[in-house]
């Protein structure tokens, strides 16, 4: 399980580090401990079989420390050393195409300009690894996507992202067990927004029997005189046929 983000205090609370947030919380929940491995240029934690994570085989948590656009090196080295296939790799990352509060699971597909995914795909020579996408929302007009993801989310956005992380964390043991399709079905069902309620139609008031409605007053009193013909105007608004 690879969490994507940028190392350093100045980045730890930015939208681009949503992948780090999930993997760090999963490590705590699983009782795993990260160690800095210079060989991978990453923080690495091992999940032993039969532990809290529920994995039947050994698994690893990875947080590359070489900045986002060079994330692929650590993934390539760990996958090569442990003979991991692309379909055995899950990359957790921020996603502009979904609003905060939404998490989606998919295998392969486009990378939508995400530099971390771009480097991983180039290093592995495939897009066929699994991806857990955490929605962070689209940038407002006039803001570049690259600048937006390096900013901190608002308090409400952060709360929504954390809620999506909670849902995904509950399904990670199922993912580690290999049931990606089952986990996907649950995740995509649970995070659908509730249907909008149609506004209630107001019923007209019930008339009391034998009660007449008050007559409506005329908006204007009609003049008995015939309507005057409009005055003719010439160029520049001057009146025609009118003596000074």
Model-found features: residue ranges?
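Short glycine-enriched, charge-decorated loop/helix-capping segments at active-site entrances
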Residues: 104-110, 149-153
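Long, low-complexity, intrinsically disordered segments
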Residues: 216-244
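Nucleotide and nucleotide-moiety/phosphate-recognizing core
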Residues: 1-108, 118-133, 139-144, 172, ...
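Active-site-adjacent loop and "lid" segments of alpha/beta metabolic enzymes
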Residues: 144-158
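A non-catalytic, amphipathic alpha-helix used as a structural packing/dimerization or gating element
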Residues: 156, 160-171
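Short glycine/serine/threonine-rich phosphate/pyrophosphate-binding segments
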Residues: 113-117
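Helix-loop "lid/cap" segments that line or gate small-molecule binding pockets
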Residues: 149-152, 171, 175
């Amino acid at each position: 399980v690879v969490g994507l983000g940028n190392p350093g205090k100045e980045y730890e609370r930015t939208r681009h580090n949503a992948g780090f947030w999930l993997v760090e919380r999963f490590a705590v929940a699983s009782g795993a401990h990260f160690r800095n491995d210079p060989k991978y240029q990453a923080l690495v934690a091992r999940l032993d079989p039969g532990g809290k994570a529920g994995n039947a085989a050994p698994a690893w948590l990875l947080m590359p420390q070489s900045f986002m656009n060079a994330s692929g090196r650590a993934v390539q080295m760990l996958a090569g050393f442990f003979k991991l296939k692309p379909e055995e790799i899950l990359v957790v990352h921020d996603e502009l195409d979904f609003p905060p509060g939404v998490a989606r699971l998919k295998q392969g597909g486009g990378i939508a300009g995400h530099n971390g995914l771009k480097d991983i795909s180039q290093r592995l020579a495939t897009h066929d690894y699994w991806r857990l996408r955490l929605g962070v929302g689209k940038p407002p007009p006039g803001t570049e996507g690259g600048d937006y993801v390096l900013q901190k989310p608002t308090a409400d956005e952060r709360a929504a992202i954390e809620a999506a992380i909670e849902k995904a964390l509950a399904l990670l043991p199922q993912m580690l067990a290999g049931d990606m399709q089952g986990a996907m079905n649950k995740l995509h069902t649970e995070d659908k927004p509730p249907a909008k309620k149609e506004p209630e139609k107001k019923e007209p008031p019930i008339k009391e029997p034998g009660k007449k409605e008050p007559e409506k007053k005329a908006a204007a009193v009609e003049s008995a005189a015939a309507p005057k013909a409009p005055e003719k105007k010439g160029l520049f608004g001057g009146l025609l046929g009118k003596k000074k």
